[in-house]
Amino acid sequence: HRICELSPQGHIVMIDPHGEYASAFKTTGALYDVSNLQMPYWLMNFEEHCEVFLTTQGSDRQVDADILAKCILLAKGKNRLAQEFGKLTVDAPIPYLLSDLTQILQLEMGKMDKATDTAPYLRLRSKIDEIKADPRYQFMFSGMLVGDTMADFIGRIFRMPSNGKPISIIDVSGVPSEITSVVVAVLSRMVFDFAIWSRGEAKRPVLLVCEEAHRYVPKDESSGGQAVRKILERIAKEGRKYGVSLGLITQRPSDLAEGVLSQCG
């Protein structure tokens, strides 16, 4: 509340894992949950796509990842926005249709000579179809979201204009646990990118607050999602250069990654 009073033009994004903060910030906060978050799946970078769509480990995972990268590039290439990029990369935030992706997987699978070579394509298509059919994933994988732009999403989440509500509370309690870390990774990356892009504008500090931070940057590097760990570590190290502050809330500080903990004041 004090930060809101001191910096009404600032932006605060709070990741709320249990839906506990909405009542505390009724007058100053805008609440987003699975009913209205509407976070387009195509905002994911490739690493985040892999965490959602890949189901294998070891050498099979690399095979699946290579196929997924090729097919996502082809799907994004169908969007007229792709022509504006000199060289299209798999990380480019360009909308694409999931139906195009599954169709391309099917076409590429048809080029295989042996039945055993089709296994990676079948795995990927099966996982994508499973996600599309699961209503819990609709907030992110709805076909309606392909018409959104990154500017639309950032404008909504960062409350521009803030209209007296500088806090965005992102309630992720309804997000399937398998993709919670990816959702937090995308939101955190949007926070960092927003700060970098708006450097030339009037100073608008951004505070990203993560409740239960040990989930996202655990001391054990093998647990938790790697994408969310990377972006939060980067914000902790570099965020202050761009006006981004990171607030980590945890009852288990000993379980936090030491690199992030050392950056905390």
What are these regions (language model features)?
Residues 22-28, 253-265:
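Short regulatory helix/loop adjacent to the ATP-binding pocket of P-loop NTPases
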Residues 172, 249-253:
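Glycine- and other small-residue-rich loops at beta-strand/loop junctions that grip anionic moieties
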Residues 19-234:
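P-loop NTPase motor domains
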Residues 227-247, 255-263:
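Transmitter module of two-component histidine kinases
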Residues 2-13, 194:
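Post-Walker A helix-loop "phosphate-sensing" segment adjacent to the P-loop in P-loop NTPases
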Residues 16-17, 211, 244, 251-252:
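Conserved H-loop
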Residues 11-16, 31, 248-249:
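Short, hydrophobic beta-strand segments that form beta-sheet elements in well-ordered domains
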Residues 7-9, 162-165, 201-204, 240-243, ...:
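Short loop/turn elements that form and flank the Walker-type P-loop nucleotide-binding site
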